[in-house]
């Protein structure tokens, strides 16, 4: 017997590790094939998206497809990703991280509203896979942003305006899912 369980009390699931992006991704498989197939599909998509995103980011930064292929393979299949995929689908779903960084770099180097909107959308996707992912990518993204901003003193105002657009897009996309936590 324990005094730590209270039957009949309500507990909010707002702070539970929901993964709206994985839910929407796997929903068709869930409806047609069941829970196991949906989980397997979401897990497989996490590996594919991680490899593809890292490939594109590395190709953008280095310009070499061979190095990009290696980076995509290593990023997608490093041991921590396998371990997380066994028990924490939300934490194993980090494939949108390199896509966010890719669009941030593209938006800084060749500013356009479209690039900043994609940057904001991919940051939001990171958050919708797992709020942890949004928090984990911020320090590296801010460091990369600062380096790129420092290299382009003439474009700083334009870049900061674009980053504000990206932040607003990310907030607008995430707000309906985060509202219960506020």
Where are these predicted regions, by residue range?
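Perimembrane helix-loop-helix junctions
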Residues: 136-170, 180
């Amino acid at each position: 017997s324990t005094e730590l369980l209270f039957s009949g009390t309500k507990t909010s699931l707002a702070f539970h590790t929901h993964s709206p992006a994985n839910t929407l991704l796997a929903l068709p498989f869930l409806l047609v094939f069941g829970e196991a197939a949906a989980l397997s599909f979401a897990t497989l998509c996490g590996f594919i998206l991680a490899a593809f995103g890292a490939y594109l980011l590395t190709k953008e930064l280095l310009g070499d497809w061979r190095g990009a292929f290696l980076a995509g393979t290593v990023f997608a299949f490093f041991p921590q990703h396998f371990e997380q995929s066994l028990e924490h689908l939300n934490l194993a779903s980090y494939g949108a991280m390199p896509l966010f960084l890719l669009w941030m770099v593209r938006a800084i180097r060749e500013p356009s509203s479209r690039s900043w909107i994609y940057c904001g959308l991919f940051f939001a996707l990171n958050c919708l896979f797992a709020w942890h992912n949004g928090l984990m990518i911020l320090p590296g993204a801010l460091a990369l942003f600062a380096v790129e901003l420092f290299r382009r003193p003439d474009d700083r105002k334009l870049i900061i305006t674009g980053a504000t657009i990206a932040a607003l897009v990310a907030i607008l996309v995430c707000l309906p899912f985060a509202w219960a936590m506020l």
